[in-house]
Amino acid sequence: MTTSQKHRDFVAEPMGEKPVGSLAGIGEVLGKKLEERGFDKAYVVLGQFLVLKKDEDLFREWLKDTCGANAKQSRDCFGCLREWCDAFL
């Protein structure tokens, strides 16, 4: 699977206070929807990812239900968080 520059940039360093829109698969529209639901930072979405025990199906379904992410967007976001966890946790 090839990854986007956004994905590579995200997983290359600690998350810190990065905005939710810095996650691969999350653009301006989805980012705004997530922010409206309290998921304003990438680390808050990471928390949900971890609560769901890094389960791909559960996380992607949650992302779809929460902000309307399509299959590619949810797959990109999941892959980004999974790779970040592999590198930093």
From Swiss-Prot:
Record-annotated HhH domain positions: 20-35
Q: Which GO terms describe its cellular component?
A: chromatin; condensed chromosome; cytoplasm; cytosol; nuclear envelope; nucleoplasm; nucleus
Q: What is the effect of changing V51E?
A: Complete loss of EMD, and histone H1/H3 binding. Reduces dsDNA and LEMD3/MAN1 binding
What would changing G25E do, according to UniProt?
A: Complete loss of dsDNA, EMD, histone H1/H3 and LEMD3/MAN1 binding
Effect on the protein of changing G47E = Abolishes homodimerization, preventing ability to cross-bridge DNA. Abolished ability to mediate nuclear membrane reformation at the end of mitosis. Abolished ability to outcompete CGAS for DNA-binding, leading to innate immune activation
User: Per the entry's comment, what about the domains?
Assistant: Has a helix-hairpin-helix (HhH) structural motif conserved among proteins that bind non-specifically to DNA.
Q: What is this protein called?
A: Barrier-to-autointegration factor
Q: Which organism is it from?
A: Homo sapiens
> What is the gene called?
BANF1
